């Protein structure tokens, strides 16, 4: 990040926190989201962590959620994907999964939150089946939320099972106007339950891009 900032002439801000990019989501309008792991990694109380992050990141509200699994990577991008200021895709697992209760509590929390525009979030659920993974993963499931949005395309990791197509359909419904592409891993390292497409990529935003914001059109309004 320092080399990149130097290359394009940006100022460098030294954030006094351990900051894992895969465990932070923002709506772009002052609202942030992470799991409790973000606080734990910094060995701070939640209030201390929130004070620092809000001072440096200009956040109005920072929501901290329970870790989905004590033995997992615990990053929020393996649990959910904000695909717009008012739309989120949240994973769904089988009832016998150790993550089930936490994931459902997470989804219920979003049902109680309002967006930047003062309306409920539009929530889409995406079923993530169990997968065969590496020895280091506990109860792994397909990480369909660990996707990459790149300009007008959405790349969704594929696992070669019957639920791959359903995952693409969820994204198409949640993100009309985007080209949704199933992305098969063609390297020697397969997609894991906690290490997939979003974990292995880094987006670079265009500071000259025009930004237009408006309320999404909802039929019930």
Q: Would you name each region that the model predicts?
A:
Residues 1-218:
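The feature marks the mature, well-folded catalytic cores of soluble enzymes
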């Amino acid at each position: 990040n320092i080399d990149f900032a130097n290359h394009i002439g940006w100022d460098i801000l030294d954030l006094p926190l351990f900051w894992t990019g895969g465990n932070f989501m923002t709506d772009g309008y002052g609202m942030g989201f992470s799991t409790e792991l973000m606080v734990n990694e910094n060995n701070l109380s939640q209030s201390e962590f929130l004070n620092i992050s809000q001072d440096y990141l200009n956040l109005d509200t920072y929501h901290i959620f329970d870790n989905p699994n004590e033995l997992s990577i615990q990053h929020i991008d393996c649990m959910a994907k904000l695909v717009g200021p008012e739309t989120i895709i949240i994973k769904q697992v089988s009832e016998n999964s150790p993550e089930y209760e936490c994931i459902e509590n997470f989804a219920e929390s979003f049902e109680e939150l309002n967006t930047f525009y003062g309306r409920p979030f539009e929530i889409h659920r995406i079923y993530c089946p169990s997968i065969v993974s590496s020895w280091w993963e506990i109860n792994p499931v397909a990480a369909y939320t660990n996707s990459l949005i790149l300009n007008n395309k959405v790349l969704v990791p594929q696992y070669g099972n019957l639920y791959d197509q359903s995952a693409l359909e969820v994204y198409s419904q949640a993100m009309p106007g985007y080209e949704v592409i199933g992305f098969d891993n063609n390297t020697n390292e397969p997609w894991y339950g906690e290490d997939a497409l979003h974990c292995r990529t880094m987006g670079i935003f265009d500071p000259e891009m025009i930004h237009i914001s408006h309320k999404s059109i909802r039929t019930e309004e």
